[in-house]
Curated annotation (Swiss-Prot):
Quaternary structure and interacting proteins, as annotated: Heteromultimer composed of HisG and HisZ subunits.
Enzyme Commission number(s) from the entry: 2.4.2.17
Keywords: Amino-acid biosynthesis, ATP-binding, Cytoplasm, Glycosyltransferase, Histidine biosynthesis, Nucleotide-binding, Transferase
The name this protein goes by in its record: ATP phosphoribosyltransferase
Primary gene name: hisG
Main location: cytoplasm
InterPro entries: ATP_PRibTrfase_cat, ATP_PRibTrfase_CS, ATP_PRibTrfase_HisG, ATP_PRibTrfase_HisG_short
Gene3D superfamilies: Periplasmic binding protein-like II
Amino acid sequence: MLTIALPKGSLLRDSIDRFQQIGLDFSAFLEPKNRQLQILDPTHRAKALLVRAWDVPVYVEYGQAQLGIVGYDILREKKPAVAQLADLNFGGCRLSVAVPQASPYRRSVDLPPHGRVASKFVHCALEHFRRLDLPVEIIPLYGSVELGPITGMSEAIVDLVSTGRTLQENGLMEIEVLFDSSARLIAHPLSYRVNGDRLLDWVEKLRSVI
């Protein structure tokens, strides 16, 4: 039976919609009273696991799920040993550097050497500033990253931006985009080879509805 890791949060509804388009129904996850973390498709052809978005590649990498849907941002940060099969063209956003609107900085390279940057994307942020040959201290924050500059703990943040409204409401502005992100279909590399025809059939169906 096919096992799929689905992400909690903003990508879930569109992920379920894509699978519904190819005949697999996991919409029970969207019911307000649902507490199940694992459900069978009514046709009993597939099973879905509901996990934190950051954990999707872990379940796929360790073989507990053959397929998964996860944001490209997470793949860039975690660098898991998974096969990226398709850009699903939803969940669009970007990873950006942002600073207070009143600050003098207009590019990443303008930040002071050894300045502080708050982010949950620690590796992506480090890679970005290393490319610029600018030494900075990355402060790991995993919620309300915007508070870093607001409280004076950091000069900047590296965070996901969708509409930019949250930044604006907190007096911040984007100064540089690191990369664009969207939902990606991933697979366990060995499962993809061993179960080639069967798994490829599901993958091709998903690609057909992008």
